[in-house]
Design a protein with these regions (language model features):
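N-terminal structural segment of carbohydrate-active enzymes
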Residues: 1-106
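Active-site-adjacent "subsite" loops/lids of carbohydrate-active enzymes
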Residues: 127-140, 144, 148-194, 204
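Active-site-proximal helices and loops of the catalytic beta/alpha 8
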Residues: 96-104, 186-193, 197-262
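Aromatic- and acidic-residue-enriched segments that line the glycan-binding/catalytic groove
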Residues: 45-75, 113-159, 243-253
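Short, solvent-exposed turn/loop segments enriched in Gly/Ser/Thr/Pro and often Arg
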Residues: 38-47, 111-120, 203-208, 231-235
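Extracellular/periplasmic catalytic domains that process cell-envelope and extracellular macromolecules
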Residues: 30-33, 98-102, 106, 122, ...
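Conserved, mostly hydrophobic/aromatic
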Residues: 29, 39, 78, 110, ...
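Extracytoplasmic/secreted proteins, especially bacterial periplasmic and envelope-associated proteins
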Residues: 17, 21-24, 91-94, 107, ...
Length: 262
């Protein structure tokens, strides 16, 4: 925990909470009038706190030093569920089935394509940070604690990363790589098979429209009415509207201009 000047406390690590906890409160959620539950990413994240970057402070933003992947946005395997979330007899597929069949609640899954884990500036390289694994647990990519400009275009372990930074020390996934696109899109299809009813897309504006068009086309070829909405943090409605065009994937967006007005 991190303490503020007036005794406030902010937690930057795991505090429990799992599928069973949500399911145990499904009736309460349903009685409040909700029809769906949106979970932050459920993918496997590194277990340790990140030792690099700028140390996180109370009330600070865009700082990752000392933080863990409790939030789920630092995936190192897009097919593997994080061990903190399931329990015996309650996989993600079983969770979505029970939410739907017993409570009439749909499941919205948060997905990421822009980045993986924090990947460089660690004093000593840490397990799972900067790494990406396939469905069988084989290492596909490794940032090797190198700054983006030091990545080697001739090293196959660096193929999945752009050679320039984007957000803090997060690995900047290279959506122009066909193998990476296949890896990501197939992972999204896998989670739909496990019961996801819709996707909330993180940092959608950081990835070119062409990727989202390809992803949308492949998903809707199998699931024509599958709903997706993106987090494009911008207050310009004309900019946000570009995501919704069919040529750009026809993906809905969160209404940040309305949020600003409120």
């Amino acid at each position: 925990p991190i303490k503020g000047e007036n005794g406030e406390v902010a937690y930057v690590g795991y505090m429990g909470g799992d599928f069973k906890g949500v399911l145990n409160n499904a009736a309460y959620i349903k009685n409040m009038g909700f029809t769906a539950v949106w979970l932050t990413p459920i993918l496997d994240n590194p277990d340790e706190a990140f030792s690099g970057g700028e140390p996180i402070t109370f009330g600070g933003a865009f700082k990752d030093g000392g933080k863990t992947g409790y939030h789920g946005y630092w995936a190192n395997n897009f097919y593997q569920i994080d061990e903190h979330l399931p329990s015996e007899g309650l996989s993600y597929k079983q969770y979505t089935q029970q939410m739907r069949e017993n409570f009439g609640l749909k499941s919205v899954l948060d997905i990421v394509a822009n980045h993986g884990t924090p990947s460089f500036t660690m004093p000593v390289d840490q397990a799972k940070f900067g790494e990406l694994y396939d469905q069988e647990g084989k290492l596909l990519a490794d940032h090797q604690n190198l700054a983006t400009e030091d990545l080697d275009p001739n090293n196959p372990l660096h193929d999945f990363f752009h050679k320039f930074p984007d957000i803090m020390q997060l690995s900047n996934l290279d959506e122009t790589n066909p193998r990476l696109r296949e890896y990501l899109i197939n992972s999204y299809l896998y989670w739909i098979e496990q019961g996801a009813d819709a996707f909330r897309i993180d940092t959608i504006k950081h990835v070119p429209h062409a990727f989202w068009r390809e992803m949308s086309d492949k998903i809707r070829a199998q699931y024509p009415n599958f709903y997706m909405f993106g987090e494009s943090f911008d207050y310009n409605p004309n900019f946000l509207a570009q995501h919704t065009l069919p040529k750009n994937g026809g993906i809905s967006v969160l209404d940040f201009p309305q949020q600003k007005a409120i």
